[in-house]
Amino acid sequence: MLMPKRVKYRKTQRGRMKGNAGRGTSVAFGSFGLKAIEPAWITSRQIEAARVAMNRYMKRDGKIWIRIFPDKPVSKKAAETRMGSGKGSPEFWVAVVKPGRIMFEADGVPMEVATEAFRLAAKKLPIKTRFIVRPDYEA
């Protein structure tokens, strides 16, 4: 699963997801992309599940790029713990995704295969997504 090797601070504040994505909004590496339509925290487990679903369908043909990285720790208190006594320990990692962000890219496969692979990947994610094709793509 994806997570940073080391971080400057172990715990972060929650923050809020205002507005649209400023960068990472166009297909850069492959010919096809999966774009986020709504904001969300995507966990490293969800990213991995989507990646596995795409790889299984594409049968290791072509190449997949993951354009998001879970760099935000989410802390959680232990079960049946009284309130107070500090913030909980980091439990899992999330990637903050805003609308318009390209999350996954693929290349080296026909459009029909890429469309189905991204559809399967989108089922593993907690947000609405859209299939994007590079403007200069020719079959």
Swiss-Prot record:
Entries under PROSITE patterns matching the protein: RIBOSOMAL_L16_1, RIBOSOMAL_L16_2
Keywords on record: Ribonucleoprotein, Ribosomal protein, RNA-binding, rRNA-binding, tRNA-binding
UniProt cross-references to InterPro entries, sorted A to Z: Ribosomal_uL16, Ribosomal_uL16_bact-type, Ribosomal_uL16_CS, Ribosomal_uL16_dom, Ribosomal_uL16_sf
GO molecular function: rRNA binding; structural constituent of ribosome; tRNA binding
A GO cellular-component term linked to this record: cytosolic large ribosomal subunit
UniProt GO BP: translation
Pfam families: Ribosomal_L16 (PF00252)
Assembly and oligomerization: Part of the 50S ribosomal subunit.
NCBIfam families membership: rplP_bact
Function (record text): Binds 23S rRNA and is also seen to make contacts with the A and possibly P site tRNAs.
Similarity annotation: Belongs to the universal ribosomal protein uL16 family.
Name the record gives this protein: Large ribosomal subunit protein uL16
Name of encoding gene: rplP
